[in-house]
Amino acid sequence: MTDELDDIHPILQGAPQTTEFRKLRKRIVRNVREALDQYGMVDGRDARWLVCLSGGKDSFTLLAALIELKWRGLLPVELLACNLDQGQPGFPATVLPEFLARMGIPHRIEYQDTYSIVVDKIPQGRTYCSLCSRLRRGNLYRIAREEGCSAIVLGHHRDDILETFFMNLFHGGRLATMPPKLVNEEGDLFVYRPLAFVAEADCERFARSMNYPIIPCDLCGSQDGLQRQQVKQILDGWEARSPGRRQVMFRALMNARPSHLLDPGLFDFAGLATGTASGRNGAEPPQLRGGD
C-alpha cells in the first residue's frame, strides 16, 4: 500500500504525514481487510453496500477505510453512505451532507423523527438507546431495500464487540456478542461489521487526526446504558493493570471449544465415547492477526 498524495481519495487528503499516523492508518485498513476476508463479506458478485454514517468517530473511520480499499481496487463493491437524521434536538443537519458532497461520496440523507417516538415510549430517567437503536435499524433496512443494497455496514469495533460479550455474560447469562456478519430476521439483507478487529482507540486517534466533523452521540440527553458503562470501566481496569488484555480476551472469542463448555446443544456430551481422540471438536480455529 502506498501513501503518495497524488493517488489518494479526497477523504484521506490532508492526512498527517507522521510515521505514527501512517502506521495507524495502515493498521486500520489491514484489520478491516482481514475482517472482510475472514468472514466472507465480499463474495465476488456485484454488490452494493449501505454504509451507515452517524457522524461519530467510528463511522467516519469505517467509511474512510472502505473507501481506501475500494480506491485501491481491493474492494469490488459499490458504496452508498447513509445518514439517518432521527430528529434529535440540536442535530447539525447540514454537516454530513456538506461533508459527503465535498468528498464526492455517493450518499443518502434520510430524515425520520424517531426521537419523538422514543421520548413518548420510554419513561423519564430511562436510557433511550435500546428503542432508538431498534427504530434506526428498521429504517436502515428499509433504505437498503429501496436503494438495492445487499448489506448494511455498521461501525461497531473490537471494543463494542467485547463489551457486548461481557454484558451478555454478566446480565444475560449467555455467551454471545455482536457477530461480524449476520443475516437479518427477514433473511434478505446482510449486516456487516468490518471494524470488528479495530480497536476503539485507533478509531479515536484516526478520526481526530483527520479532523473529520465529528458529531457527539449524546444530543438526545440520554447516556449509553449503565450496564455498558460498568463493563467498559471493568475492561479499562483490566487493561490498565495488564496491558494487552483486551486483545487477548477478544482473541478468545475466535477460539471457542464447545467440548470444554457446558452446552449440550453445541457438543454431544451424551454421545461421547472412549476409544476416540479427546474432543477438541474440530480443527484449531483461525487466530487473529494484526491488532494493536
UniProtKB/Swiss-Prot annotation:
GO terms for molecular function: 4 iron, 4 sulfur cluster binding; ATP binding; magnesium ion binding; sulfurtransferase activity; tRNA binding. Its EC number is 2.8.1.-. Keywords: 4Fe-4S, ATP-binding, Cytoplasm, Iron, Iron-sulfur, Magnesium, Metal-binding, Nucleotide-binding, RNA-binding, Transferase, tRNA processing, tRNA-binding. The keyword Transferase applies. This is tRNA-cytidine(32) 2-sulfurtransferase. Binds 1 [4Fe-4S] cluster per subunit. The cluster is chelated by three Cys residues, the fourth Fe has a free coordination site that may bind a sulfur atom transferred from the persulfide of IscS. Homodimer. Catalyzes the ATP-dependent 2-thiolation of cytidine in position 32 of tRNA, to form 2-thiocytidine (s(2)C32). The sulfur atoms are provided by the cysteine/cysteine desulfurase (IscS) system. CDD domains: TtcA-like (cd24138). The thiolation reaction likely consists of two steps: a first activation step by ATP to form an adenylated intermediate of the target base of tRNA, and a second nucleophilic substitution step of the sulfur (S) atom supplied by the hydrosulfide attached to the Fe-S cluster. Its cofactor is Mg(2+); [4Fe-4S] cluster. Pathway: tRNA modification. The gene is ttcA. [4Fe-4S] cluster binds at C129, C132, C220. A motif (PP-loop motif) lies at residues 54-59. Belongs to the TtcA family. Its main location: cytoplasm. GO terms for cellular component: cytoplasm.
